[in-house]
From Swiss-Prot:
Keywords, sorted A to Z: Cell inner membrane, Cell membrane, Membrane, NAD, Quinone, Translocase, Transport, Ubiquinone
Role summary: NDH-1 shuttles electrons from NADH, via FMN and iron-sulfur (Fe-S) centers, to quinones in the respiratory chain. The immediate electron acceptor for the enzyme in this species is believed to be ubiquinone. Couples the redox reaction to proton translocation (for every two electrons transferred, four hydrogen ions are translocated across the cytoplasmic membrane), and thus conserves the redox energy in a proton gradient.
Major subcellular site: membrane
E.C. numbers: 7.1.1.-
Membrane topology, record value: Peripheral membrane protein
Reactions that this protein is recorded to catalyse: a quinone + NADH + 5 H(+)(in) = a quinol + NAD(+) + 4 H(+)(out)
Domain of life of the organism encoding this protein: Bacteria
PANTHER family linked to this entry: NADH DEHYDROGENASE [UBIQUINONE] IRON-SULFUR PROTEIN 2, MITOCHONDRIAL, NADH-UBIQUINONE OXIDOREDUCTASE 49 KDA SUBUNIT
Organism in which the protein naturally occurs: Burkholderia cenocepacia (strain HI2424)
Pfam families in UniProt: Complex1_49kDa
A GO cellular-component term linked to this record: plasma membrane
Protein known as: NADH-quinone oxidoreductase subunit D
Disulfide-linked positions: none
A Gene Ontology molecular function term of the record: NAD binding
The organism's taxonomic lineage, starting at the top: Bacteria, Pseudomonadati, Pseudomonadota, Betaproteobacteria, Burkholderiales
């Protein structure tokens, strides 16, 4: 009788469903996965080491490039750690703006996830729908920071600037007639806050559209139900966080359990799954988008009523105003010193964690009293999730490995960092 042998297959790093640079070495028995060995490091850029040779403020843009789908939430963890060490108070308005943009980023992340996950599984349409909404939110990023993705908007002590009074508008071109232009600029006639408000008023309908396409879709359920099941106990043991943990039925959300900024004033629910499979994790993330709408609406309401400063008044940390810089020599010198030498952070260590769209994103910061971090450790949620891939994929088909990678919502910027 012929000897039965398992064969080994390389999945990625060029595979379209590998989400970037994932290389999986799969050991297969026929089409059934016996072992999945993820090989990481193909996107390693030594972020932690680079941060040691840059001033505290110069490392903010590095944070955007970790999980490059959830840019501002990465910055949030980093600036929180610096603020802990400095012991400075962030103005209330800046805290509300941060919470608002955390939720905008959460929606951006989940839109990317639902589009890519559905595309991997074979549902093309949702991808196009999701990117239609992402476009509007990217424009909000651009309005406040000047960049569509890598914003560097959060700064130690607050945010870069207050929300602008005008939303950038589409300009006339060869391909846009007056009628189309007027329709596109309809929601853009007011302030950025008006535009965000309008977006979150329209957005529940969009989420309903995604659910119409997927939630009760027979093929979608066949591909997701019962795949990649993780029990609550194993989820905790493997260090899963965020929707991966909540999908297994554990209501752990840092916004509720360890509130930072003004999350303790927000009224929202934490969605949890029942079965711990890919379908439950899908439902959790869709519901998270709906909860983000609730939080964003509360922030918008507060921001409309309460103007105020968006940066701390501690001049050792906060740069002078642009107007002051152009008229006052001292302000110019102060600005130059702040952006060349940077500020010195007291000796000590701090850990700050935020509820990132993918899980718990933590920054462990050690300062030796200099103007640069002595050590910066990044706790990326995706790292623990990828480590659990082997256990989740065992006994499933190759096609299911694609579903499991999609449900983990993996981005390699933060895993390889």
């Amino acid at each position: 009788m012929a000897e039965i042998k398992n064969y080994t297959l390389n999945f990625g790093p060029q595979h379209p469903a590998a989400h970037g640079v994932l290389r999986l070495v799969l050991e297969l028995d026929g089409e059934v996965i016996q072992r999945a060995d993820p090989h990481i490091g193909l996107l390693h850029r030594a972020t932690e080491k680079l941060a040691e040779s840059k001033t505290f403020i110069q490392s903010v843009p590095y944070m955007d490039r970790l999980d490059y789908v959830s840019m501002m939430v990465n910055e949030h963890g980093y600036v929180l750690a610096i603020e802990k060490l400095l012991g400075i108070e962030v103005p209330e308005r800046a805290q509300y703006i941060r919470v608002l943009f955390d939720e905008i980023t959460r929606v951006l992340n989940h839109l990317m996830w639902i589009g890519a996950h559905a595309l991997d599984v074979g549902a093309m349409a949702v991808f196009l729908y999701a990117f239609r909404e992402r476009e509007d939110l990217m424009d909000v990023y651009e309005a406040v920071s000047g960049a569509r993705m890598h914003a560097a908007y959060y700064r130690p002590g607050g945010v870069y600037r207050d929300l602008p009074d005008a939303m950038p508008q589409y300009k006339a071109s060869k391909i846009r007639n007056e009628k189309a232009l007027a329709k596109m600029n309809e929601a853009r006639s007011g302030s950025v806050l008006d535009f965000i408000d309008d977006f979150f008023t329209r957005f529940p309908k969009c989420v309903d559209e995604y659910e119409t396409l997927l939630t009760d879709n027979r093929i979608w359920k066949q591909r997701l139900v019962g795949i990649g099941v993780v029990s609550p106990e194993r989820a905790l043991q493997m260090g899963l966080t965020g929707p991966m943990l909540r999908g297994s039925g554990i209501a752990w959300d840092l916004r509720k359990k360890q509130p930072y900024e003004v999350y303790d004033r927000m009224d929202f629910d934490v969605p949890v799954g029942v079965n711990g499979d890919c379908y439950d994790r899908y439902l959790v993330r869709v519901e998270e988008m709906r909860q983000s709408i609730r939080i964003a609406k509360q922030c918008i309401e507060w921001l409309r009523k309460n103007p105020g400063p968006v940066m701390t008044d501690n001049h050792k940390v906060a740069p002078p105003s642009r107007v002051g810089m152009k008229t006052n020599m001292e302000d110019l010198i102060h600005h130059f010193k702040l952006f060349t030498e940077g500020f010195h952070v007291p000796e000590g260590e701090a850990y700050a964690a935020v509820e990132h769209p993918k899980g718990e994103f933590g920054i462990y910061l050690v300062s030796d009293g200099a103007n640069k971090p002595y050590r910066l450790k990044i706790r990326a949620p995706g790292f623990a999730h990828l480590a659990s891939l082997d256990e989740m994929a065992r006994g499933h088909m190759i096609a299911d490995a694609v579903t499991i990678i999609g449900t983990q919502d993996i981005v390699f910027g933060e895993i390889d960092r």
